[in-house]
């Protein structure tokens, strides 16, 4: 009997120890310093829901556990790596870009080059064919004036259905042709004056003008000399007292001063 009681007491003692250890463990879990298991479970469930919502949510949370049943949780922000789709339409931009309008106009203006007998040759653009009405209107305007201002040229081109370049080229060709005809003498000066330009007048020869002026001056000098009194050929009365002086000597003596006076008067006129 004593052995039976001893075994019963031993079992009871072991049960008490087990229950006490269970209660102590339960209280330690309910202490404020340790996280509650229910909160931990709810956070884990929330993290699992976030992971299911985003394709990159599996790496959004990290959990570190140690041997003492303590868990520390680190939450990180989830970044959406969707910029590849946003810039998708511009991936091939730059490899083939459409030409600008300036480049297109430049290409149109450049003449076409073809190979003729192994040599490059520029192909001329076809000439503009003007209608009868357009030619008549251009000719009438050319008779009024040979040079057009920019507003006049734009107005004339719009009224005739032509471009300003075509009108400008027509006037340039017409002016060059008109000058050639006028220089060759096929166009009279009156028509050239009517068209807006005055022909150059031939200048008189300078030699003829100088001869006319010189002859007029000489006539004036001669008329002045003819009006003057002729020299006195008689001997003055005061020379009669000197018998050695004759009339021939007096005439010869008085003649040089006469020529001298003529020279002085002519120089004064000139």
UniProtKB/Swiss-Prot annotation:
Residues 30-52 have a biased composition (Polar residues). Residues 123-182 bind DNA. Pfam families: DLL_N (PF12413), Homeodomain (PF00046). Belongs to the distal-less homeobox family. One of its GO terms (cellular component) is nucleus. This is Homeobox protein Dlx2a. Residues 19-64 are annotated as: Disordered. Residues 54-64 have a biased composition (Low complexity). Involved in the development of the inner ear. The keyword Nucleus applies. Keywords: Developmental protein, DNA-binding, Homeobox, Nucleus. Its main location: nucleus. It is found in: Nucleus. The keyword Glycoprotein does not apply. The lineage of its organism: Eukaryota, Metazoa, Chordata, Craniata, Vertebrata. It comes from Danio rerio. GO terms for biological process: cartilage development; cell differentiation; embryonic skeletal system development; embryonic viscerocranium morphogenesis; negative regulation of photoreceptor cell differentiation; neural crest cell development; peripheral nervous system development; pharyngeal system development. Expressed in the developing forebrain and fins. GO terms for molecular function: DNA-binding transcription factor activity, RNA polymerase II-specific; RNA polymerase II cis-regulatory region sequence-specific DNA binding.
């Amino acid at each position: 009997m004593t052995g039976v009681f001893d075994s019963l007491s031993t079992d009871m003692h072991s049960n008490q120890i087990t229950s006490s250890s269970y209660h102590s463990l339960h209280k330690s879990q309910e202490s404020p310093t340790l996280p509650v298991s229910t909160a931990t479970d709810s956070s884990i469930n929330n993290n699992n829901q976030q992971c299911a919502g985003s394709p990159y949510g599996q790496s959004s949370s990290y959990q570190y556990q140690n041997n003492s049943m303590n868990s520390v949780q680190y939450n990180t922000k989830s970044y959406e790596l969707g910029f590849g789709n946003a810039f998708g339409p511009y991936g091939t931009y730059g490899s083939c870009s459409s030409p600008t309008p300036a480049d297109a106009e430049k290409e149109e203006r450049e003449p076409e080059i073809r190979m003729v007998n192994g040599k490059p040759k520029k192909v001329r653009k076809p000439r503009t064919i003007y209608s009868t009405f357009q030619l008549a209107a251009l000719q009438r305007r050319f008779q009024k004036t040979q040079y057009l201002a920019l507003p006049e040229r734009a107005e004339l081109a719009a009224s005739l259905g032509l471009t300003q370049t075509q009108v400008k080229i027509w006037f340039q060709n017409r002016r060059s042709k008109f000058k050639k005809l006028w220089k060759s003498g096929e166009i009279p000066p009156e028509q050239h004056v009517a068209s807006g330009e005055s022909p150059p007048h031939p200048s008189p020869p300078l030699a003829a003008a100088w001869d006319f002026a010189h002859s007029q001056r000489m006539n004036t000098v001669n008329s002045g000399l003819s009006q003057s009194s002729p020299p006195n050929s008689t001997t003055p009365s005061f020379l009669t007292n000197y018998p050695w002086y004759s009339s021939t000597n007096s005439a010869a003596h008085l003649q040089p001063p006469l020529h001298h006076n003529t020279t002085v008067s002519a120089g004064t006129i000139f």
